[in-house]
Regions:
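Predominant activation on well-ordered alpha-helical scaffold segments within soluble catalytic domains
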Residues: 33-38, 97-104, 153-161
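Non-transmembrane, aqueous-exposed alpha-helical and coiled segments at domain scale
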Residues: 107-109, 183
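N-terminal glycine/serine-rich phosphate-binding loop of ATP-dependent small-molecule kinases
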Residues: 1-68
């Protein structure tokens, strides 16, 4: 947290369930990723004996716009796509891209995967994702409802069906995400039909 700012830190959960906040100077994402890798190898905090045990690195990306409707392996084209969407989520996507490049610099032969937070909502129809503003705003500036917290909504909707012992397809579900942000999603037959964001 707070990469590039004063008082940067990493929160870890130890094997016994206790939690620690470790302060560390992280002037950039490469230093932040390097520190996380060090923690993964630390006998107290980590779970690895060698970074060679890492088969792939996953990144949760906040904004995939309408370019990314599912998770994908990072390629030059994927990086360019994420970069093209920085204007839609400047605080998040720029940091995500820097994180991808940092991992690539430190572990160039390790595959990376992106999980787009709004991809779960890509099944919404235009009547649900378009705002009541001139259509030109959508065409020119990509102003629309994208949906967020998709990884949470996907998990909760599947978990609710497991808990209730019902088939995911064929259900009408409303999910609520309340964390650092809050949103709701309406899901029908396993597809998002509307969202509050």
């Amino acid at each position: 947290e707070r990469v590039g700012l004063d008082e940067a830190f990493v929160k870890v959960t130890l094997k016994d369930g206790s939690k620690e906040k470790i302060m560390h100077d992280m002037p950039d994402h490469k230093e932040g990723v390097k520190f996380v890798f060090q923690l993964l190898l630390d006998p107290k905090y980590g779970a690895l004996k060698s970074l060679d045990e890492i088969d792939a690195v996953g990144h949760r990306i906040v904004q995939g716009g309408d370019l990314f409707e599912k998770s994908c392996i990072v390629t030059k084209e994927v990086e360019e796509g994420i970069e093209s969407l920085i204007e839609l989520a400047p605080v998040h996507n720029l940091g995500h891209l820097r994180g991808i490049k940092a991992v690539d610099a430190l572990m160039p032969h390790t595959p990376q995967v992106t999980v787009f937070d709004n991809a779960f909502h890509s099944t919404m129809e235009p009547y649900a994702f378009l705002y009541a503003v001139p259509y030109e705003m959508y065409e020119k500036y990509h102003v629309r409802r994208y949906g967020f917290h998709g990884t949470s909504h996907r998990y909760v909707s599947h978990r609710a069906c497991e808990f209730l012992g019902v088939d995911y397809k064929g259900q009408k579900i409303i999910t609520c995400h309340i964390g650092n942000g809050a949103s709701m999603a309406a899901i029908k037959d396993g597809k998002v039909v509307d969202t509050s964001m």
